[in-house]
From Swiss-Prot:
Might be virulent against a mammalian host; when expressed in E.coli, the soluble extract has hemolytic activity on human erythrocytes. The activity is not inhibited by cholesterol or activated by 2-mercaptoethanol. Might be pore-forming protein. Its in vivo role in virulence is untested, nor has it been shown to be secreted by B.cereus. The keyword Transmembrane applies. It is found in: Cell membrane. The chain crosses the membrane at residues 19-39, 49-69, 83-103, 112-132, 138-158, 165-185, 194-214. One of its GO terms (biological process) is killing of cells of another organism. One of its GO terms (molecular function) is toxin activity. The keyword Transmembrane applies. The lineage of its organism: Bacteria, Bacillati, Bacillota, Bacilli, Bacillales. It comes from the Bacteria. GO terms for cellular component: plasma membrane. This is Hemolysin-3.
Length: 219
């Protein structure tokens, strides 16, 4: 009984940490979304507003669904929140791609990659609906591969984002990828909360890259 209580206590502590870390992300995502929309409205076209909105909303949903999953434990909603949480990862990946592909790259390459990424994201969401608690390692690998598909357009991205913007993009990708190691490291105490911190860091890098370099004020 003591061992069981110890495990339960540790579980509660870790879930509190998980909820707090991404709860902070959910709160910060609200002003981030507002800033993105205002910035795109002032300095971009209608397509920029759409792209920035899609990105901002996808970021907010990821943190919202994650916070709900780790905050509310009830048999009737746990599976639903798990599906929403895992699906939101696909949404964030595709949502993050959207401003880079619609604004930074544009043209045939941008539209082609956009179609591919959103098709993969939709396929991943459908997969999660049926297999949300299975193939976790394979799903994590899929997230990473999707995130790094942008490497096929590395040259035009670097040229358009400049060195500083590209550095932020690269830093964000690295933080997301390194964080996945902790996500899979289940024996490490608070591994999930540590992963959440890497996700927050990756989101911050991507946000500032989109805000300052995808649609510079000077343009």
């Amino acid at each position: 009984m003591t061992e069981k209580m110890t495990r339960m206590t540790q579980f509660v502590k870790e879930e509190i940490a998980n909820a707090i870390t991404h709860g902070i992300g959910a709160i910060l995502s609200i002003p981030a979304l507002i800033i993105l929309i205002i910035h795109a409205s002032k300095h971009g076209t209608a397509s920029a507003v759409v792209a920035f909105t899609v990105y901002g909303v996808s970021m907010f949903l990821l943190y919202l669904f994650s916070t709900l999953l780790h905050s509310i434990h009830h048999p009737k909603v746990e599976k639903l929140f798990t599906i929403l949480d895992h699906s939101a990862i696909y949404l964030l990946i595709a949502g993050t791609y959207t401003p880079f592909l619609l604004i930074t790259l544009r043209g045939p390459l941008g539209w082609t990659l956009l179609a591919i990424i959103w098709t993969l994201a939709i396929g991943g969401i459908i997969f999660k609906i049926f297999f949300v608690r299975r193939f976790i390692k394979a799903s994590t690998l899929c997230y990473i591969i999707m995130g790094w598909l942008i490497i096929v357009a590395i040259k035009p991205l670097y040229e358009n984002l400049t060195g500083h913007g590209f550095s932020l993009l690269l830093a964000g990708g690295i933080l997301y990828s390194v964080g996945a190691i902790f996500f899979l490291w289940e024996k490490l105490p608070f591994n999930h909360a540590i992963w959440h911190l890497f996700v927050l860091g990756g989101s911050a890098m991507m946000f500032f890259c989109v805000l300052f370099y995808v649609l510079p004020t000077a343009s």
